[in-house]
Amino acid sequence: MGIPESQLDTWSHQGSIAQSASTYSIIKNALESANTKYHGKNFKVFLQGSYGNDTNIYAESDVDVVICLDDVYYSDLTQLSPEDKDAYDRAFVPATYSYTQFKQDVLEALTERFGSDVKVGDKAIVVAANGSRRKADVIASMQFRRYWKFKGHYDSQYDEGICFFNGAGERIANYPKQHSENLTLKHQASNKWLKPMVRVLKNLRSKLIADGKLKSGLAPSYYLEGLLYNVPNEKFGTSYADCFVNAMNWIQTEADKDKLVCANEQYYLLWEGTHTSWEKADAEAFIDAAIKMWNEW
């Protein structure tokens, strides 16, 4: 018979934001301190993830923070013509401030403020929860540019993102600004059903994991947002139950899954072996488990 509307409505509600806002403010102040080694350089600090996109649920506590240095940038030149690539190479000036040094300086800034609560993870610098302060994952990043045209510094076109390096030294580029902006536009175009439906899927995922029906880590929130981002606007509306059924039917019977995109519209949503796309098998495992739970409720 499906999951009752009352349950879906409960799942659709946004979690508390007061503690996360306070945590973000504390982390941001530490990163923007005048005592940091990167003070005076051009950088920005912003929220990403569930709190940044208003898709957080009650069970969530981690706050995702990005510090991005704009004085140095990495580039993707694969879309440039040979002539434009030559022009880029002639204009390029190597940076003297390395990513490794910047991340170390960010680590020092956080350690200066939070002491032993700070640890380096594979991708993020983790600031442990303490008292009313929530756990924060801080990504130290540099500007990233995917170039489409380069005739000179004042005659170029590129999509701007961020990039960072994981523990294995692999460069990971992403586009949080585009993700957030596109998600908000889609939310408005869907008559404001999108973000509550993301929260429904996230709570459903939590229940699947708690019930032993889905392995933890297979369905990150970022990809659930991406999945619903692809669903046509007319599939949203009337009730959460209708939204769920219409979305799942569209994904399973109408969508060309190879053409689904991430909400940033820079990467395909389903792709094998990358840090920026959802493994197809993981996506199928979540979708199948979600439909099964719906049918057996």
From Swiss-Prot:
GO terms for biological process: defense response to virus; nucleotide metabolic process. It comes from the Bacteria. Its EC number is 2.7.7.-. Its cofactor is Mg(2+). It catalyses: UTP + ATP = 3',3'-cUAMP + 2 diphosphate. Binds 1 Mg(2+) ion per subunit. ATP binds at Q48, G49, S50, K202, S221. SUPFAM superfamilies: Nucleotidyltransferase. InterPro entries: NT_2-5OAS_ClassI-CCAase (IPR006116), NT_sf (IPR043519). One of its GO terms (molecular function) is nucleotidyltransferase activity. It is an enzyme of class 2 (transferase). Cyclic nucleotide synthase (second messenger synthase) of a CBASS antivirus system. CBASS (cyclic oligonucleotide-based antiphage signaling system) provides immunity against bacteriophage. The CD-NTase protein synthesizes cyclic nucleotides in response to infection; these serve as specific second messenger signals. The signals activate a diverse range of effectors, leading to bacterial cell death and thus abortive phage infection. A type II-A(UA) CBASS system. Cyclic dinucleotide synthase that catalyzes the synthesis of 3',3'-cyclic UMP-AMP (cUMP-AMP) from UTP and ATP, a second messenger for cell signal transduction. Controls the activity of cUAMP-activated phospholipase CapE, a patatin-like lipase that is a direct cUMP-AMP receptor encoded in the cdnE operon. This is Cyclic UMP-AMP synthase. The gene is cdnE.
